């Protein structure tokens, strides 16, 4: 039965049916401090990682772009800065996060290139072969069914379109893995005490084992 399927939320095993609601609840709780949380957790490196990701994009003139799990619209902003004729569909399952992204787009003057929509990456409300580029940064781990989400992204891509996914993975170097685990369990929770009313859940939502 579908309701008996299990998935991971951080290091916790939960029912697949519960994951999307858990993810939505976590990001409701951290929305106001989301950018600060990311800066603390990555030591500011997440901005460099996103920039490096987008340097891989090969786009035609006037590209149509879909960004999934957009958060506060970091990736759409970077895309529009480098491709000012781009039209970007900015999506997230969390309306609180999406509202922050919309406000940022207004304040930083890239709103005219964006359309904001509350939507799940596992059930995209777009026709086949719509986008030249689909991007997702640090969001795939929070999908309940990652294969379903990836198939949806592929469905929405035009022929010769590109999918760019930025995500954590398990370190291949055993020494680095020990350092990373120590950082995850000792440093991250303390950082999140200052940014989230529920630091444990926020930490779980950002750990690579969710992927």
Which residues make up each language-model segment?
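N-terminal auxiliary segments of SAM/dcSAM-dependent transferases
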Residues: 1-24
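Class I SAM-dependent methyltransferase SAM/SAH-binding core
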Residues: 64-123
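Hydrophobic beta-strand segment of the Class I
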Residues: 34, 134-135
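A short acidic, Gly/Pro-enriched loop at the edge of an enzyme's catalytic core
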Residues: 122-133
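A short glycine-rich, Lys/Arg-flanked "PGG" loop and its adjoining helix->strand segment in the class I
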Residues: 147-159
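Conserved class I S-adenosyl-L-methionine
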Residues: 162-190
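Single conserved hydrophobic/aromatic residue that forms the stacking wall/gate
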Residues: 194-211
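Conserved alpha-helix/loop element of class I SAM-dependent methyltransferases that forms part
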Residues: 33, 43-61, 78
